Swiss-Prot record:
Active up to 62 degrees Celsius. Disulfide bonds join 22-63, 56-96, 152-203. Keywords: Disulfide bond, Hydrolase, Protease, Secreted, Thiol protease. Its EC number is 3.4.22.-. Stable in 8 M urea and 2.5 M GuHCl at neutral pH, in 40% acetonitrile, 70% ethanol and 50% methanol. Unstable in SDS. This is Ervatamin-B.
Length: 215
């Protein structure tokens, strides 16, 4: 595997978005992963609709939370997902618009072996990967720069996306895309320590990784 991967430098990652006061991190994580694999497969980087997932994915709970795999399944079953432009974000759950376009589709989704950071690294080398982390603690919330080493627990309360990895001064890290706007963290991103002692990964990052597949 390459020692350094950053999908942003390959133009495969959209600019940072902001979920605002809505518990829709799951939709932002899923959409970002889909945007990236679509760019990798087709060469087109299109901003897609988190709001469609919030309004239309009945397996999830809108602004009260959800899971990325349910979001991927919605996109598969629906035959695609609309663009951000056609179905813009409002940060509140509304009724599902019947006239929505199927602009980008996926074939399926794959779970990465749980609690295994080397399997996770292998997956991220091929495309950005959706993961869950515990983000409720003050140290995570107040992160600004450098490699975050905790402390944090492993409750799966926030969905984010790993868009790369590397090593700095002997410390391995993940490049993690958040959905709290560009003013949070390091321009919307957090570098999280990688290959920690716990198999769950820092803040539980290796507990539930998955990614969308596209032929």
């Amino acid at each position: 595997l390459p020692s350094f991967v950053d999908w942003r430098s390959k133009g495969a990652v959209n600019s940072i978005k902001n979920q605002k006061q809505c518990g829709s991190c799951w939709a932002f994580s899923a959409v970002a992963a889909v945007e990236s694999i679509n760019k990798i497969r087709t060469g087109q980087l299109i901003s897609l609709s988190e709001q469609e997932l919030v309004d239309c994915d009945t397996a999830s709970h809108g602004c009260n939370g959800g899971w990325m795999n349910n979001a991927f399944q919605y996109i598969i079953t629906n035959g695609g997902i609309d663009t951000q432009q056609n179905y813009p974000y409002s940060a509140v759950q509304g009724s599902c618009k019947p006239y929505r376009l199927r602009v980008v589709s996926i074939n399926g989704f794959q779970r990465v072996t749980r609690n295994n950071e080397s399997a996770l690294q292998s997956a991220v080398a091929s495309q950005p990967v959706s993961v869950t982390v515990e983000a409720a603690g003050a140290p995570f919330q107040h992160y600004s720069s450098g490699i975050f080493t905790g402390p944090c627990g492993t409750a799966q309360n926030h969905g984010v996306v790993i868009v790369g990895y590397g090593t700095q001064s002997g410390k391995n890290y993940w490049i993690v895309r958040n959905s709290w706007g560009q003013n949070w963290g390091n321009q919307g991103y957090i570098w999280m320590e990688r290959n920690v002692a716990s198999s769950a990964g820092l803040c539980g990052i290796a507990q539930l990784p998955s990614y969308p597949t596209k032929a």
